[in-house]
């Protein structure tokens, strides 16, 4: 009962390594009414632990000076420290952390009573949110504590951060797997019960459900197992069912108790599914009709003989009759002609799937050769460096 319930690893290793790599390390311990102190130089104790006074405080102060013999640079980056300390304050609601940079007389205080809710709010600052922040904490029977906070916004990126015993896992792990499984199941169940999938004629995926999602997953595990010493991925098998069970229960209740938020979230997911399907069709179209294979294009394009994009020109003309005149008057060596119908579509205001279903827009995309969508678009493949 006198030891920590959870920790990131072997507690003594961290301070031992810091001690060995420091020209000086000083420990001050306030305990049982006495103040103790010990000092080390390059890892060697200068004197035994000794009592230097009385105190009514409790806690330990560790001061260290990185060794210039070991490190070529011993200057601390305050931005890196600030980011990590702010993160720790979010993860431990009510813990007050003070960062002082005595080089420039700077002091930052991190104290977030809202914990993970404030973490999500901080990340989503400046974005339009679709729902109020959903936040819960629960303790499993096997000693695993699960805390989750999430909110959807109007962006198209997923931003999910995972932590085990306050340590970040950039590669996720079993806690992320449990979270994703429960999230997708809960949303699919809600949309099926509301008959939204049949009504909208879409098939949604887990990626659709997480578009625009900001979430923090924090678990406290008595004996965590990681894939490597850097602890970038959690592999403890017992964590997945603990997170999945807790998330299933809490998130399903949230959707039922907040119908307006659930409707907004479902609407965004359906839009994401449509856009994903449209992007898939666009990729298939551009692959079938390779920009280098003009036979794959509709017969409207009269291409030029020049293959160097820097010397090639593309003229977009309105209608077939104008196209005929342009073809007669062009320089075949460097000028290509593509007739299009007038006012084909205002793509700025059209949804992605409607835009890509336009034959004229599809013809233009294929003729230019750059592809479409975040993954496929490549401006270096533009076939004409002058477009008129």
Swiss-Prot record:
It catalyses: ATP-dependent breakage, passage and rejoining of double-stranded DNA. The record marks 343, 346 as: Interaction with DNA. Its EC number is 5.6.2.2. It is found in: Cytoplasm. GO terms for biological process: DNA topological change. A type II topoisomerase that negatively supercoils closed circular double-stranded (ds) DNA in an ATP-dependent manner to modulate DNA topology and maintain chromosomes in an underwound state. Negative supercoiling favors strand separation, and DNA replication, transcription, recombination and repair, all of which involve strand separation. Also able to catalyze the interconversion of other topological isomers of dsDNA rings, including catenanes and knotted rings. Type II topoisomerases break and join 2 DNA strands simultaneously in an ATP-dependent manner. Belongs to the type II topoisomerase GyrB family. This is DNA gyrase subunit B. The lineage of its organism: Bacteria, Pseudomonadati, Pseudomonadota, Gammaproteobacteria, Moraxellales.
